[in-house]
From Swiss-Prot:
Membrane-spanning ranges: 125-145, 147-167, 174-194, 197-217, 237-257
InterPro entries assigned to the protein according to its UniProt record, in alphabetical order: Yip1/4-like, Yip1_dom
GO process terms (BP): endoplasmic reticulum to Golgi vesicle-mediated transport; insulin processing; protein transport; regulation of ER to Golgi vesicle-mediated transport; vesicle fusion with Golgi apparatus
Organism whose genome encodes this protein: Macaca fascicularis (Crab-eating macaque)
Source species, domain of life: Eukaryota
Lineage: Eukaryota, Metazoa, Chordata, Craniata, Vertebrata
Sequence similarity: Belongs to the YIP1 family.
GO cellular component assignments: COPII-coated ER to Golgi transport vesicle; endoplasmic reticulum exit site; endoplasmic reticulum membrane; nucleoplasm; trans-Golgi network
Protein known as: Protein YIPF5
Keywords: Cytoplasmic vesicle, Endoplasmic reticulum, ER-Golgi transport, Golgi apparatus, Membrane, Protein transport, Transmembrane, Transmembrane helix, Transport
Subcellular location per the Swiss-Prot or TrEMBL entry: Endoplasmic reticulum membrane; Golgi apparatus, cis-Golgi network membrane; Cytoplasmic vesicle, COPII-coated vesicle
Length: 257
């Protein structure tokens, strides 16, 4: 033990004191600490000047009852973003341009060739009805064993483009491509009847030829009547009916053969 005490005494320096080390390590708040010069002059009470003035206002006490809130706490009704409520917005079908009343009137105009066509309604660009009639025409051809959807759409596009160019040359007001496609599509309705007859019996006999000629005349007369009333082309119905008859004659050939 005497040797161990001598060893510990020799290990520490003569000027080193454990009491001085503990005082130097833990006395951070005193004036003699190593950090006293850096942090002693900082005033923590200065943080209050950065608080916004609105946050320092005292809150008003709630004077109402729990089950009967005052008017100040009544939530306001949300304001609409677009200025109008949802009840005032038009229906989705009207925004898409689908009007069942106009579709029905155009269909009746085609089914009654002698009926006077309304030019204001017929001048609209409505492609909902023509698309339905084109699909119905292709479906009836499919029932007859003729997969001709590509021919139907291709001939329809070429025919609409040709009639669009022709009517713009003949009329003074001009016409849009959508209006031409709409009228020609609606007048395809009698051709659906012809393709439906082809499902039941053959149209390659004399009866079929007469029926086919009547359907072609029906379609071309209805289309020319609508174009004349919509574009104010009085006295030119035969000139418009001839190219329409050529177009619907191609559809009739697809139905017969």
């Amino acid at each position: 033990m005497s040797g161990f005490e001598n060893l510990n005494t020799d290990f520490y320096q003569t000027s080193y004191s454990i009491d001085d080390q503990s005082q130097q390590s833990y006395d951070y708040g005193g004036s003699g600490g190593p950090y006293s010069k850096q942090y002693a002059g900082y005033d923590y009470s200065q943080q209050g000047r950065f608080v916004p003035p609105d946050m320092m206002q005292p809150q008003q006490p709630y004077t109402g009852q729990i089950y009967q809130p005052t008017q100040a706490y009544t939530p306001a009704s949300p304001q609409p973003f677009y200025g109008n409520s949802f009840e005032d917005e038009p229906p989705l079908l009207e925004e898409l341009g689908i009007n069942f009343d106009h579709i029905w009137q155009k269909t009746l105009t085609v089914l009654h060739p002698l009926k006077v066509a309304d030019g204001s309604i017929m001048n609209e660009t409505d492609l909902a009805g023509p698309m339905v009639f084109c699909l119905a025409f292709g479906a009836t051809l499919l029932l007859a064993g003729k997969i001709q959807f590509g021919y139907v759409y291709g001939i329809s596009a070429i025919g609409c483009l040709g009639m669009f160019c022709l009517l713009n040359l003949m009329s003074m007001t001009g016409v849009s491509f959508g209006c031409v496609a709409s009228v020609l599509g609606y007048c395809l309705l009698p051709m659906i009847l012809l393709s439906s007859f082809a499902v039941i019996f053959s149209l390659q006999g004399m009866v079929g030829i007469i029926l086919t000629a009547g359907i072609i005349g029906w379609c071309s007369f209805s289309a020319s009547k609508i174009f004349i009333s919509a574009l104010a082309m009085e006295g030119q119905q035969l000139l418009v009916a001839y190219p329409c008859a050529l177009l619907y004659g191609v559809f009739a050939l697809i139905s017969v053969f």
